[in-house]
Curated annotation (Swiss-Prot):
Lineage per the UniProt record: Bacteria, Pseudomonadati, Pseudomonadota, Alphaproteobacteria, Rickettsiales
Family: Belongs to the RecA family. RadA subfamily.
Name of the molecule in the record: DNA repair protein RadA
TM region positions: none
PANTHER family noted in UniProt: DNA REPAIR PROTEIN RADA (PTHR32472), DNA REPAIR PROTEIN RADA-LIKE PROTEIN (PTHR32472:SF10)
PROSITE patterns: RECA_2 (PS50162)
Residues in C4-type zinc fingers: 10-27
This enzyme's EC code(s): 3.6.4.-
Length: 445
């Protein structure tokens, strides 16, 4: 009897080593090395010749199936594509299972036949949640299983009746080919690879729910994200009632698209007036508060930027940013000090994006700078105004992409003053162009 060999693999970068260590020598992550058993019973398999195709051959657009959830359709690029594999991650309790159960129980126009497979709950728990969510589509099939071979055999037995399969979650699925426990790198990689191949061979849509680490990254090997066609993150704060579904990879659409949802006692609801969700209605502007006209994917979104500046006796005053890059905040402070003489070295500075949103758009620089200047001078910003524009190290305001989209969203919500970089081919009376931070300072005065 041959003895199986073993090696050690990093759960973060999949680097292989022959002995255990506390830290991965390749990516430097601590505590990520796990043991993996290698089966030695391998036979030599020869390949067969494959026919080549030409890049210039005609190909039709992928058939998209629109879901009853319009926000999900937007994130996916128009709907579900047959034969695609979709990965959706998020923190525990954020609403992944609820969203997927509502999707499978939805009334598709194309009469999709859906199967919901759970490896974390019992069938009675799924039924109780369906009752709580007032789901009345009892034609949705449900299955409690964790073995890969059993799952594929069950789908094969009803191959003509299943169009969409949800697996919650991929970390609970195991294969008989491996002796390692569920959730290990080898189990996740092997099971995900088999499921993705199966979906493409049988033209079935597969949605895989997955856990995330404490850093917010998808748990398991990075290859998991490479295997699937689409990677979605369900973001949000447990203290807030809204959720953001964001696409980080999409072979059939654009990345960066977001869908806005609201958690309620009856499940997850779509939000149509998404900008109003993140804005507080006030009669007058508050010192240190500005409105940023942003774009997430193709969706315009207005967000509130708040800044607070207080004197400090500390040798190194605190700099805190919630929902924004702290390094970029330091850069903006340095530019304000160097270019317009706003010295905040002896002050504690707190910056927050209201509603728990996270902004990575460089065009938010101008809104942040406006909030900081307003907080430092105790002068409220102009009424009903929005800001967008990227700030360079020289203090100049750079051009911004999708400016017209941002302006139209601001006008739609009742804002009558747009403070931004200099625009070409756009001449509106309510646009106040800035070419330098000095211009912004004059506007606030």
């Amino acid at each position: 009897m041959t003895r199986d060999k073993k090696h050690y693999i990093c759960s973060n970068c999949a680097n292989i080593s022959h002995k255990w260590s506390g830290q991965c020598f390749d990516c430097g992550v601590w505590g990520s090395i796990v043991e993996e058993i290698i089966s030695t019973n391998k036979s030599i398999i020869t390949g067969s010749k494959q026919t080549f195709d030409k890049l210039s051959c005609d190909v039709s657009e992928p058939l998209r199936i629109s879901t009853p959830i319009s926000e999900l359709n937007r994130v996916l690029g128009g709907g579900l594509v047959l034969g695609s594999a979709i990965l959706i991650g998020g923190e525990p309790g954020i609403g992944k299972s609820t969203l997927l159960l509502q999707l499978t129980a939805s009334n598709f126009e194309s009469k999709m036949r859906c199967l919901y497979i759970t490896g974390e709950e019992s069938l009675d728990q799924i039924k109780l949640r369906a009752i709580r969510l007032n789901i009345t589509n009892y034609n949705t099939a449900i299955l409690a299983a964790t073995n890969l071979e059993d799952i594929i055999a069950s789908i094969d037995d009803n191959n003509n009746n299943i169009d969409l399969v949800v697996i919650d979650s991929i970390q609970t699925i195991t294969t008989k080919e491996l002796s390692s426990p569920p959730g290990t790198v080898s189990q996740i990689r092997t099971c995900a690879n088999e499921l993705v191949n199966y979906s493409k061979q049988n033209n079935i849509i597969i949605l895989l729910s997955c856990h995330v680490t404490k850093d917010g990254q998808i748990a398991g090997p990075k290859i998991l994200e490479h295997l699937v066609d689409t990677v979605l993150y369900f973001e949000g704060d447990h203290n807030n009632h809204f959720r953001i579904l964001r696409s980080y990879k999409n072979r059939f659409g654009s990345i960066g698209e977001i869908g806005v949802f609201e958690m309620s006692s009856s499940g997850i609801l779509e939000v149509t007036n998404h900008s109003e969700l993140f804005l507080m209605k006030r009669e007058h502007n508050v010192v240190g508060t500005s409105i940023f006209a942003g774009v997430e994917g193709s969706r315009p979104l207005l967000m509130e930027v708040q800044a607070l500046i207080v004197p400090s006796n500390m040798l190194t005053p605190k700099r805190s940013a919630v929902g924004w890059d702290a390094n970029r905040l330091s850069m903006i402070l340095a530019v304000l000090s160097s270019r317009i003489g706003l010295n905040l070295a002896n002050y504690e500075i707190y910056l927050s994006i209201a509603g728990g949103l996270k902004i990575t758009d460089p065009a938010s620089d101008l809104a942040v700078a406006a909030s900081l200047i307003s907080a430092a001078t105790s002068i409220p910003l102009p009424e009903h105004s929005v800001f967008f524009g990227e700030i360079s190290l020289s203090g100049e305001i750079r051009k911004t992409a999708k400016a017209e989209t941002r302006i139209k969203e601001a006008v739609k919500l009742g804002f009558n003053k747009v403070i931004c970089s200099k625009l070409e081919n756009l001449t509106y009376d309510f646009i106040c162009s800035c070419t330098h931070l000095q211009d912004l300072k004059e506007i606030i005065k």
